[in-house]
Amino acid sequence: MDLSIKSPLAFLDFTTQNFDPHGDIHMLAVSKHATIMAARLGLSAAEIEWIEVGAKYHDIGKLFIPESIRRFPGLFTPVEQLVMQQHCQIGAQMLQLLGLPAPVVAIALNHQENYDGSGYPSALRGRNIPIGARIVRIVDSFDAVTHDRGYRHACSKKRALEKLHERSTHYDPDLLDLFETLIHETWDAVPGK
């Protein structure tokens, strides 16, 4: 790893571990599975590293969302939803200010974009969404539904995969197929059967 980005990453690690220990677990899980997907796709070592880092810090902008919204135990009002959606731009700006590479910044900015163009912040569609963000979109969704939230209980891995397929237009179909293959290959190693 480039030494010029090690200090900013150490800062981000310290910040997330002390600010939101449960979020840190999510970030590590998303990073691990996104990295496995990137490697399976045969991406370059640099691309894999960017995806590993971008996946880990994809939600870093949530640190600047009011706690009353971040930890709200129910569904958001339209205004709360708009505030929460700002985490993508805030996170991207933060990573950019810390000097992280553009592909890492792009993951934070675009990880809520949907393959069908219905996502945010820019309503990108298809392959206009960077590959790292398309990978993180899938892995993040899976990890989110396999863990308890204030407004719902965790799903089994089987049910989580069904949920991804119910919203399949949100995800790159080739990457979704790869993810499902990888989950089945590593079924016993993934928490929350």
Predicted regions and their residues:
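Histidine- and acidic-residue-rich, metal-dependent catalytic cores
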Residues: 2-193
